[in-house]
């Protein structure tokens, strides 16, 4: 029964990642020549499929390198136009697939699901964006990477902060290390003035979400467990502020975690990892920009 639950959970996670990609790329292009966009999209799906698995297989130290490289490539390929906030789909999808690892037949099914997801996303992307013309090609995305560019610094910041916070959480043996990574990813926005505001929304939001879950879970019939995630998803859709999104997001995450690490551990570690990840990202961002700005000034 436990194996069946894990297969259902893995299918749900992969389904969420694919759905997010379809919804995003239905409206957003990659800012390069359409045929080469499909090459970029294929690279993105290859990373989403094999990167998280490789990071899990290689442990904390090997995972640090794999996560950094994969997240950086995702940022360069998919987040060239920062106003689209594509990182909230691509990096989130990567971290979900990393956190909910699969093996054996479950991973084989994941491979087929990701292949299907790529085909479906590619069809939607090509149908909606094939007539758009750009002089920029796939190679230009990497050629334009330059630390004098705020976009490039943000891409490097994201890869560095998220991979390192997961590494620290892993070597400390904290359950659900991906939560710290997701927290860091969520607050590291391309516009620096928004970062502190998101930190101040995410931490109280997870505290309130944890309190709500702690109070209702002991009294919830087992048959209604799946409803919690649905309610959380609906709540996110209707939330007018980032803080309330954090509240409802935490409900579904803790519901899944209960089956893995138990109750009330899921509540404690959800809150702890989000506080850690958010504050780590805030401090890392300040240090990162201080160091890079000094290096850039020294070269002038």
Residue spans of the language-model regions?
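Transmembrane alpha-helical segments of multi-pass membrane transport proteins and ion-pumping complexes
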Residues: 1, 40-53, 67-76, 114-126, ...
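Short, small-residue-biased leader/transition segments that mark boundaries at the very start
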Residues: 3-8
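Hydrophobic alpha-helical transmembrane segments
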Residues: 9-15, 55-66, 101-109, 148-154, ...
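Pore- and pathway-forming membrane helices of multi-pass small-molecule/ion transporters and channels
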Residues: 11-29, 44-45, 64-103, 118, ...
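Transmembrane helical segments that form the transport core of multi-pass membrane transport proteins
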Residues: 163-217
């Amino acid at each position: 029964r436990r194996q069946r639950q894990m297969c259902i959970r893995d299918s749900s996670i992969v389904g969420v990642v694919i759905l997010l990609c379809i919804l995003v790329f239905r409206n957003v292009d990659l800012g390069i020549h359409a045929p080469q966009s499909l090459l970029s999209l294929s690279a993105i799906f290859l990373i989403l499929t094999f990167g998280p698995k490789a990071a899990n297989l290689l442990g904390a130290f090997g995972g640090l390198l794999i996560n950094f490289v994969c997240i950086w490539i995702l940022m360069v390929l998919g987040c060239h136009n920062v106003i689209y906030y594509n990182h909230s789909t691509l990096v989130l999808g990567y971290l979900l697939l990393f956190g909910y690892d699969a093996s054996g037949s479950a991973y084989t099914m994941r491979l087929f699901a990701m292949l299907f997801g790529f085909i479906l996303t590619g069809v939607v992307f090509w149908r909606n964006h094939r007539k758009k013309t750009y002089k920029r090609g796939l190679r230009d995305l990497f050629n334009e990477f330059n630390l004098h560019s705020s976009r490039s610094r943000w891409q490097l910041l994201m890869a560095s902060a998220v991979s390192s916070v997961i590494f620290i959480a892993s070597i400390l043996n904290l359950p659900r290390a991906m939560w710290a990574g997701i927290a860091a990813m969520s607050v590291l926005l391309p516009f620096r003035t928004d970062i502190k505001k998101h930190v101040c929304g995410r931490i109280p939001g997870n505290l309130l979400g944890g309190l709500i879950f702690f109070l209702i879970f002991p009294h919830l019939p087992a048959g209604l467990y799946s409803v919690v995630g649905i309610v959380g998803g609906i709540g996110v859709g209707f939330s007018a502020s980032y803080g309330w999104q954090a509240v409802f997001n935490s409900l579904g995450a803790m519901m899944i975690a209960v089956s893995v690490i138990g109750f009330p551990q899921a509540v404690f570690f959800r809150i702890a990892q989000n506080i850690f990840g958010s504050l780590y990202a805030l401090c890392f961002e300040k240090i990162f920009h201080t160091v890079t700005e000094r290096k850039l000034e020294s070269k002038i």
